[in-house]
Curated annotation (Swiss-Prot):
Keyword field: Membrane, Mitochondrion, Mitochondrion outer membrane, Transmembrane, Transmembrane beta strand
Role summary: Component of the ERMES/MDM complex, which serves as a molecular tether to connect the endoplasmic reticulum and mitochondria. Components of this complex are involved in the control of mitochondrial shape and protein biogenesis and may function in phospholipid exchange. MDM10 is involved in the late assembly steps of the general translocase of the mitochondrial outer membrane (TOM complex). Functions in the TOM40-specific route of the assembly of outer membrane beta-barrel proteins, including the association of TOM40 with the receptor TOM22 and small TOM proteins.
Stated name of the protein: Mitochondrial distribution and morphology protein 10
UniProt source species: Lachancea thermotolerans (strain ATCC 56472 / CBS 6340 / NRRL Y-8284)
Top-rank taxon, per record: Eukaryota
Primary localization: mitochondrion
Membrane topology listed for this record: Multi-pass membrane protein
Assembly and binders: Component of the ER-mitochondria encounter structure (ERMES) or MDM complex, composed of MMM1, MDM10, MDM12 and MDM34. Associates with the mitochondrial outer membrane sorting assembly machinery SAM(core) complex.
Disulphide-bridged cysteine pairs: none
Length: 458
């Protein structure tokens, strides 16, 4: 379950027009949400409050062998943020839970419109966040600054009495088709560069679908530790598309780390509006070791309720998990305009020209009908996800190499966001040192950790 402060940060990004899915850091977010979801450990209780439209506070208390607590405060000068931040009673479960990330292709009209409108509508905004942990007296701070529509500066700092303080700076530039990121950290003098390039969607000869709703992205990262002179790098390919017959989205990724010889491929598909399946295969070229992981989530619907009308975006805007396309529903209800031919603006010519236009319309009529059908099928499936009021979700993942099973339940009850789960492992039991050499304890399926987390916000 997403913490309240993380929800405010994502709402800030959405309000300022920043797309977190167009970053190399989140290029494999879908498979990670389904396979490597976080299972709570111990008992954690979190209470949050929006005291003013620009200030937010959170108090957290946890009990994992010892009692810990934290107090967080967030301030932002972003205008209109209250339209995106929801309390625990009103927030949709698919927005509060980490799940499948829907990626829409970015066409040239999007970047042109964002650049022209951004100069008129965009206003610089900033976000300040701080959290103090007790009893360790560890301080966590973050500053996010949006100076222009395409740039973002992020500074993160952790100060602790027991360990050395760490300061990390991020400078990000997102032009739509390319997203570049420069990173500098005081931890080992780490310097990094990330880039993600989106290939503009176009009709492929190998693609039999007329309505091309696919997205192909290729990115990489370079890291270098100045103090220990250690390099690191990786590259990833991501392909997102929809089934033309059912409208169901799927995502494929292929990652490669040439220094360590690690190759990873993932396949994630939303089989229905209430079920998602993901698989991952890892292979090392040097050690010849491999691993196969599976994960899924199953959603249960609750009572139907009317969505908040303020969460609407234009039809031709890039899609995110929380986007709502009100104009799509209006056009879908109205239906296509059958009386308007394809080249109606050229019908005022001669008789021979009109005959030629009529022949063209007859020739391409079947193709146009197929395009409209495929587009409406995809949009109908997306609208079913946006309009759904889910009450709970079950998440499961397993790994053949590690022989573990993760189980997580997330839901809403009486205004509370509840997350409860356990991780079962097949590792052998640890024996005392005086009995370690006598016999081997057989591996048993036992809970490695379990816990529950409750969140309440107003």
């Amino acid at each position: 379950m997403i913490d309240y402060m993380e929800h405010v940060l994502r709402s800030f990004e959405q309000c300022t027009g920043w797309n977190r899915d167009n970053s190399y850091e989140n290029v494999t977010a879908t498979s990670e949400n389904l396979l490597s979801f976080r299972v709570p450990s111990g008992v954690k209780f979190q209470v949050s409050n929006k005291s003013t439209p620009n200030t937010f506070t959170t108090f957290e208390l946890s009990n994992n062998k010892v009692i810990n607590g934290s107090l967080a405060y967030l301030y932002t000068n972003c205008q209109g943020l209250e339209n995106y931040v929801s309390n625990s009673r009103d927030i949709l479960l698919q927005e509060a839970s980490e799940t499948y990330r829907q990626i829409r292709p970015l066409y040239p009209c999007h970047s042109l419109r964002s650049s022209s409108d951004g100069a008129k509508e965009f206003g610089p905004s900033s976000l300040w966040y701080g959290r103090m942990y007790y009893p360790t007296s560890t301080l966590e701070a973050m500053v996010v600054s949006r100076s222009s529509a395409q740039t973002q500066f992020v500074a993160k700092c952790i100060s602790s009495l027991a360990n050395a303080s760490v300061l990390t700076l991020y400078w990000q530039k997102d032009s739509g088709q390319n997203c570049q990121e420069w990173v500098a950290s005081t931890n080992e003098g780490l310097l990094g560069y990330r880039i993600l390039h989106n290939f503009v969607g176009s009709q492929s000869k190998l693609n039999t679908s007329l309505y091309n709703d696919s997205s192909l992205s290729v990115g990489g990262e370079l890291w270098f530790g100045v103090l220990n002179t250690t390099p690191a790098c990786s590259t990833t390919l991501r392909y997102c598309t929809h089934s033309a017959n059912t409208g169901k989205p799927l995502t494929l990724t292929l990652s490669w780390n040439p220094l360590f010889g690690h190759v990873s491929s993932t396949y994630s598909v939303k089989t229905s509006s209430g079920a998602t399946f993901s698989s991952k295969y890892d292979f090392n070229l040097y050690s010849i070791e491999s691993n196969l992981s599976f994960g899924c989530d199953l959603w249960r619907r609750g009572h139907t309720k009317q969505l908040d009308q303020r969460r609407t975006e234009p039809l031709d805007a890039p899609n995110t998990n929380s986007s709502v396309f009100s104009k799509e529903r209006v056009q879908k209800k109205q239906g296509p305009k059958e009386d308007s031919p394809m080249f109606y603006h050229l019908m005022a010519g001669s008789t021979s020209s009109q005959k030629l236009i009529e022949d063209l319309n007859v020739t391409f009529a079947s193709s146009l009908q197929k395009l409209t059908k495929e587009k409406s099928t995809i949009q109908r499936f997306e609208n079913s996800l946006i309009d759904a009021n889910f009450a709970s979700v079950w998440k499961l993942s397993t790994s053949l190499r590690h022989k573990n099973l993760r189980v997580l339940w997330e839901g809403k009850y009486k205004g509370f966001l509840i997350s409860a789960g356990a991780e079962f492992t097949g590792a052998p039991l640890e024996l005392p040192s005086n009995l370690a050499g006598e016999s081997k304890t057989p591996a048993l399926i036992r809970p490695g950790k379990f816990g529950i987390q409750l969140q309440y916000s107003t």
